[in-house]
């Protein structure tokens, strides 16, 4: 039972080992392991072609083709090098978001520190990739073509700040959407339960709001999928900038 809307996002130690060094396994760690195991199982099915012609198999193939087309469309002929990374990240976010929709589960993607750290890691990887491929020429990315010489210092500063903000915005967008959606569902659900348990009239008047909560829940499932896809689109675009410098 949650006594505060924010209780569902609290990190709770499940196993605490204290000696010279404190080591703990939290609910975040547990769900991280669960999502990782599902991805390993999922990847094994694809790799060994165990899908068949079932609806499940068709769905997996559709997801695979969708992300492959996305990567090839964004990055071009070199997209195949980066497809495994983007496909894995898409599935990780998607599975984590869908698991978080199970009542009383834990939303990995709503941990802002974790998702921002994740996006920061990817951003650093993009910078390293750009420097590896282009050397100092990578910084030409911050100078738009055809820029008058007098405006170069200003535009370089603006472009550099815009590029640096990706390190936070990529993860913050994901975390904020999942966090706000789960808070909204829990707050509305708690209010409806309080209303319906107050009296018979309250029980009757709470039926219509329940339908609204059901609609919001369906919307949250859609957001869970969309956010994974948006994250993949943005990451593909950022990799394209590092590869092609535009």
Curated annotation (Swiss-Prot):
Question: Propeptide per record: which residue ranges?
Answer: 1-3
Q: Which residues cross the membrane?
A: 21-41, 56-76, 82-102, 113-133, 138-158, 184-204, 206-226
Membrane topology of this protein: Multi-pass membrane protein
InterPro entries linked to this entry = ATP_synth_F0_asu (IPR000568), ATP_synth_F0_asu_AS (IPR023011), ATP_synth_F0_asu_bact/mt (IPR045083), F0_ATP_A_sf (IPR035908)
Q: Which GO terms describe its molecular function?
A: proton-transporting ATP synthase activity, rotational mechanism
Q: How is the subunit organization of this protein annotated in UniProt?
A: F-type ATPases have 2 components, CF(1) - the catalytic core - and CF(0) - the membrane proton channel. CF(1) has five subunits: alpha(3), beta(3), gamma(1), delta(1), epsilon(1). CF(0) has three main subunits: a, b and c.
Q: Write down what this protein is called.
A: ATP synthase subunit a
What is the organism of origin for this protein?
Candida parapsilosis (Yeast)
Q: What is the lineage of its organism?
A: Eukaryota, Fungi, Dikarya, Ascomycota, Saccharomycotina
Question: What gene makes this protein?
Answer: ATP6
């Amino acid at each position: 039972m949650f006594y505060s809307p924010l209780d569902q996002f609290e990190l709770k130690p499940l196993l605490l080992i204290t000696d010279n060094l404190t080591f703990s396994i939290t609910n975040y760690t547990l769900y991280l392991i669960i999502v990782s195991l599902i991805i390993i199982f999922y990847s094994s099915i694809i790799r060994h072609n165990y899908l068949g012609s079932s609806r499940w198999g068709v769905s997996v193939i559709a997801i695979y083709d969708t992300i492959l087309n996305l990567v090839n469309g964004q990055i071009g002929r070199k997209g195949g090098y980066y497809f495994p990374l983007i496909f894995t990240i898409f599935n990780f976010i998607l599975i984590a978001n869908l698991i978080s929709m199970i009542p009383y589960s834990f939303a990995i993607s709503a941990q802002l520190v974790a998702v921002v750290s994740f996006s920061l890691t990817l951003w650093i990887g993009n910078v390293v990739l750009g420097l590896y491929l282009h050397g100092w020429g990578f910084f030409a990315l911050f100078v738009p073509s055809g820029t008058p010489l007098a405006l170069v210092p200003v535009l370089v500063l603006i472009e550099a700040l815009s590029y640096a903000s990706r390190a936070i915005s990529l993860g913050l967008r994901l975390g904020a959407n999942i966090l706000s959606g789960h808070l909204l569902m829990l707050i509305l659900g708690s209010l409806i339960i309080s209303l319906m348990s107050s009296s018979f009239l309250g029980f009757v008047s709470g039926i219509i709001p329940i339908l609204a909560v059901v609609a919001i829940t369906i919307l949250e499932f859609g957001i869970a999928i969309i956010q994974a896809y948006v994250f993949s689109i943005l990451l593909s675009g950022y990799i394209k900038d590092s590869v092609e410098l535009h």
